[in-house]
Amino acid sequence: MVFNKKTIEDVDVKGKRVLVRCDFNVPLQEGKITDENRLIGSLPTIKYLMENNAKVILCSHLGKPKGEVKPEMSLLPVAKRLSELLKKEVVFAADDNVVGENAKAAVKNMKDGDVILLQNTRYRIEETKNQDNFSKELASLGEIFVNDAFGTAHRAHCSTVGVTKFLPTAVCGYLIQKELEFLGNAIENPSRPFTAILGGVKVSDKINVINNLLEKVDTLIIGGGMSYTFARAQGYTIGTSVVEEDKIEYAKEMIDKAKEKGIKLLLPIDRVVTDKFDESAEPILEDDKNIKDGYMGMDIGPKTAKVYADAIKDSKTIIWNGPMGVFEFKNFAKGTFAVAKAMAESGAITIIGGGDSAAAINQLGFGDKMTHISTGGGASLEFLGGEELPGISALNNK
């Protein structure tokens, strides 16, 4: 995909009310933000608008309140932290109906360069149904719409798509621009050898991604829970490991397709297994492609990790989506760590496709060694699968 959308730099924002859809869906513990990467990611767009004398109206969802007012999902902590990060008060419009008296009064009193944040858009049941009445209310606050929430770009909601019906000037912010340029270039014009690493539990979540990437990559590496479905497709025993019976045939087809296209498809040759899914479970090395009855695979083994690391070191572009094992359990994080370390040392263009891989990379301390960590789990998956993202399609073309 070639990046052809208008950005905030293509429109005159001076003195204008600009409604910005951000992704402030951050983890909260007792009202404290435990990971503020998404807030940091939104700052360049917000600062640009402030410096160019726009009146900045921010909106986002947080969690899944499903149309109910849930105080623990209020965006108040986000407003407080943003005020600190921007060194300027971000006025919080605390309306349970999102566009209420507080929001309207705050917008009315805005001066150029001011910033307000609306309440959680998913407090409204209409938001996820993309219903016109709520889209219209949101749009009534602004004159220009900016979407900078890559994490929800694959959702057609009021605050991502619906508002563009009523605010014809709709452009993207810096974060979406950066995401599309990195992911788009990696897929359409990669420096080669180009390697994709796929992990996580389900093959079914990644079917489009595998199909699309097999048209583009030189090497495809598979780990995580989904690798057991591939192991079954190769005729190996997998004990009590997770498997998608209805995807074994598909895995066989993909193994054949890779062979046909001359693509290196790397699958595990040894495993770390255990007899119960538990953090305290003892890791046992299974130095074989077969897993014994009563045992389940929890991570790739050291031989596999070495083969994968060598392939990574030979690459010029690497995209990674999904961990190699149950990295949340210390005993089963070595495979994910080995892949992360190899990527950090590769000197290649390294792109992490959001979600669990982003969490793993940051947790293991390799975040600053990656070229780009995507802010969108589902969105980056759909994009890598070659699908249109409604939140992007709705924006003005250049």
Swiss-Prot record:
Positions with a binding annotation for ATP: 206, 297, 328, 354-357
UniProt xrefs under Gene3D superfamilies: Phosphoglycerate kinase, N-terminal domain
Positions annotated to bind substrate: 23-25, 38, 61-64, 122, 155
PROSITE patterns: PGLYCERATE_KINASE (PS00111)
GO aspect biological process, one term: glycolytic process
GO CC term, one of those recorded: cytosol
A Pfam family annotated for this UniProt entry: PGK
InterPro entries listed in its UniProt record: Phosphoglycerate_kinase, Phosphoglycerate_kinase_CS, Phosphoglycerate_kinase_N, Phosphoglycerate_kinase_sf
Protein EC: 2.7.2.3
Coiled-coil region: none
UniProt keyword annotations, A-Z: ATP-binding, Cytoplasm, Glycolysis, Kinase, Nucleotide-binding, Transferase
Cellular localisation: Cytoplasm
Any GO molecular function: ATP binding
Pathway: Carbohydrate degradation; glycolysis; pyruvate from D-glyceraldehyde 3-phosphate: step 2/5
Chief subcellular location: cytoplasm
SUPFAM superfamilies documented for this protein: Phosphoglycerate kinase (SSF53748)
Top-level taxon of origin: Bacteria
Catalytic activity of the protein: (2R)-3-phosphoglycerate + ATP = (2R)-3-phospho-glyceroyl phosphate + ADP
Family: Belongs to the phosphoglycerate kinase family.
Assembly mode: Monomer.
Protein name stated in the entry: Phosphoglycerate kinase
Source organism of this protein record: Clostridium kluyveri (strain ATCC 8527 / DSM 555 / NBRC 12016 / NCIMB 10680 / K1)
